[in-house]
Amino acid sequence: DMPNGGRGPAEWQMHKYYDGADAIRSAASEANYRKEWKEIIDYLYSYPSIGVWVPFNEAWGQFKTPEITKWTKEYDPSRLVNPASGGNHYTCGDILDLHNYPGPNLYLYDPIRATVLGEYGGIGMALKGHLWLADKNWGYVKFNTPEEVTNEYIKYADHLLELIEKGFSAAVYTQITDVEEEVNGLVTYDRKVIKVDEPKIKAINQKICNSLNK
């Protein structure tokens, strides 16, 4: 997910990423957002797999962040609230969520809330015969073999281990599967080919998961 709508990493890098400038919505737009956000929570309230509500992603349509976060926490006090995943950051809610590509980076920290890396990675490998589009694919970095993808993943994971010691509480890799023209999945778009060395990926992931069990 890029703030420019997916038109390319160059524009993503130039985007004003966390300057705190929320959108100014019309009264009708705000009312529609509030209505639909409440409907989403009402519909998904009983799903035990949902542990965090995220009102905004990467500043898309983000507005009145502290107010929306406060309402969400009061409406469902049983769950954590991540005010904006990779968006304009405010000192509200339970989580400070950073996005960084391709490798992990801890460029902001909050000692009160959980500091998480909500997105990183994007290691691309286009595998012919398993693509959504045959000739238009991208990743933040691109490789040609499973060995190269695995080695790059492990390199990022090793760096992540260092950042966990400095303050990260969680991290989310982009992404599990290819998504349309995004070929940065660990598995192809058709779910037929795993593009990495499974035992090596499992080993480094377990090392990360157990890194705080000391």
Identify the residue ranges that each predicted region occupies:
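Active-site mouth of glycoside hydrolases
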Residues: 1-95, 100, 104-112, 131-135, ...
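Substrate-binding clefts and catalytic carboxylate motifs of secreted carbohydrate-active enzymes
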Residues: 34, 49-53, 70, 108-214
